[in-house]
């Protein structure tokens, strides 16, 4: 049997574009496969600009702590392709084994009969095929891009549809206004299904989501609208809805935004029919959750050995303007607890708003090193990122690699060991985890 990598190489030749948002091709393929999308466990469908993966990670951790099996489909992967598909099992799921993935992809290739289809579409079909054949209690399904015409939007009646915070990203596909992006995300709302709307950073996004949820005949459940609320109190997470109030531990994932994501996850599970999950399982989920590359502290590994003694090394895949704002706020919160100089190591794609992203760190970062992202044709040259950073008011210089940037820190005199944040791209995150020898599991 061909490996999944060999199959992917062939799939790339089946469509001239990596992204082509429509449902016709995947609906045709799913019909030929016997409609696996109709044979799934209850589905919680998740869209949004920021926080989708973290919200799913919280849900999975809580479900597994409750003794339930949760299938998970997310994208993109960080290092290895099979990270996108997690097969649920009681006691904890695992990434789909290579032989199972290759078999499912081969079956999809055969059913597709050489017709045009994108890699994401055929991967989604393979994931749904696997999930339909392996029993589980729930499927946590992340939208790839947008929602309305995303390949995952083939579930007629999800147990719940969730939209996490919306911002401006992927304007070439979703539109260049928050309202346009919200309209695409709201396309996952379905008649008579709960529509969980997380706290939004933009009032216009919240208004569009609520209006379109009602227009779809969904049952909107909004944070802060007497449906549910979540806030930090004395370093703990307080969640309240129309039936319960939970005083919970601080989420293990770092950053104030993770309180919002955790609360959204709890609301989604309760709306989707998992309201009998007890406080102990919720607490265990918040304490044990993992989501690599999102404010992840690297305490061991090859790269962590390159930093000055006593330094902190952090990694985050934030890459859009709002992601940068969230990330800067998290770094500022850490800075309030200890006045440690912040060093940024940044790699960005050319499709992202580099100026908007970097401006969030003005007055916060002591120095920035711009680095290339290997094997990414769309990556901005490091020299260009450094120039943009300097133009917005950051002290910046280019480095040939993350390793070179880390090694050069020994030439800078800091009053105390610095806090180092590598950020700007999930592709960069994958490269860093690989170089550090700490792959996602």
Label each region the model flagged:
Residues 1-50, 54-69, 79, 194-202:
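N-terminal leader/targeting and accessory segments in enzymes
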Residues 17-19, 23, 27-41, 65-156, ...:
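ATP-dependent carboxylate-amine ligase catalytic core
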Residues 40-42, 133-134, 138-141, 149-162, ...:
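Nucleotide phosphate-binding/pyrophosphate-handling subdomain across enzymes
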Residues 72, 222-223, 297, 398-399:
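A structural preference for short, hydrophobic beta-strand core positions in alpha/beta folds
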Residues 115, 135-143, 158-249, 262-284:
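Acidic, Mg2+-coordinating active-site environments of NTP-dependent enzymes
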Residues 200-221, 231, 270, 309-315, ...:
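C-terminal helical cap/extension that packs against the catalytic core
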Residues 425:
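Active-site-proximal loop/hinge segments that shape catalytic or ion-binding/gating pockets
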């Amino acid at each position: 049997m061909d490996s999944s990598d060999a199959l992917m190489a062939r799939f790339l030749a089946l469509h001239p574009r990596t992204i082509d948002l429509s449902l016709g091709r995947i609906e045709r393929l799913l019909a030929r496969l016997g409609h696996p999308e109709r044979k799934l466990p209850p589905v919680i469908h998740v869209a949004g600009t920021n926080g989708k993966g973290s919200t799913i990670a919280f849900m999975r951790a809580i479900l597994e702590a409750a003794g339930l099996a949760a299938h998970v489909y997310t994208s993109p992967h960080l290092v290895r392709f099979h990270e996108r598909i997690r097969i649920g099992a009681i006691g904890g799921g695992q990434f789909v084994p290579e032989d199972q993935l290759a078999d499912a992809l081969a079956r999809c290739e055969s059913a597709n009969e050489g017709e045009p289809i994108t890699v994401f579409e055929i991967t989604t079909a393979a994931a749904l095929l696997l999930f339909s054949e392996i029993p589980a209690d729930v499927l946590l399904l992340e939208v790839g891009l947008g929602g309305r015409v995303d390949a995952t939007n083939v579930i007629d009646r999800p147990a719940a549809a969730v939209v996490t915070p919306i911002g401006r990203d992927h304007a070439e596909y979703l539109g260049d206004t928050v309202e346009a992006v919200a309209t695409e995300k709201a396309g996952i709302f379905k008649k008579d299904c709960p529509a969980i709307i997380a706290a939004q950073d933009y009032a216009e996004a919240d208004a569009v989501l609520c209006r379109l949820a009602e227009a779809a005949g969904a049952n909107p459940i909004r944070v802060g609208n007497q449906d549910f609320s979540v806030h930090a109190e004395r370093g703990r997470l307080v969640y309240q809805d129309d039936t319960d109030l939970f005083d919970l531990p601080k989420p293990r994932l770092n950053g104030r935004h993770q309180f919002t994501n955790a609360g959204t996850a709890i609301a989604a599970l309760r709306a989707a029919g998992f309201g009998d999950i007890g406080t102990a399982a919720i607490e265990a989920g918040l304490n044990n959750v993992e989501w690599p590359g999102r404010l992840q502290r690297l305490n061991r590994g090859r790269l962590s050995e390159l930093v000055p003694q006593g330094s902190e090394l952090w990694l985050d895949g934030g890459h859009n303007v709002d992601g940068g704002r969230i990330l800067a706020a998290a770094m500022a919160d850490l800075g309030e607890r200890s006045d440690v100089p912040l060093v940024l190591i940044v790699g960005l794609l050319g499709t992202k708003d580099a100026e908007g992203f970097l401006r969030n760190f003005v007055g916060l970062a002591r120095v920035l090193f711009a680095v290339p992202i290997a094997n990414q044709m769309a990556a901005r040259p490091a020299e260009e990122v450094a120039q943009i950073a300097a133009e917005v008011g950051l002290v910046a210089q280019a480095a040939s690699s993350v390793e070179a940037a880390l090694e050069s820190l020994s030439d800078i005199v800091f009053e105390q060991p610095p806090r180092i944040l590598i950020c700007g791209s999930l592709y960069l995150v994958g490269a860093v985890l690989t170089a550090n020898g700490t792959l996602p599991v």
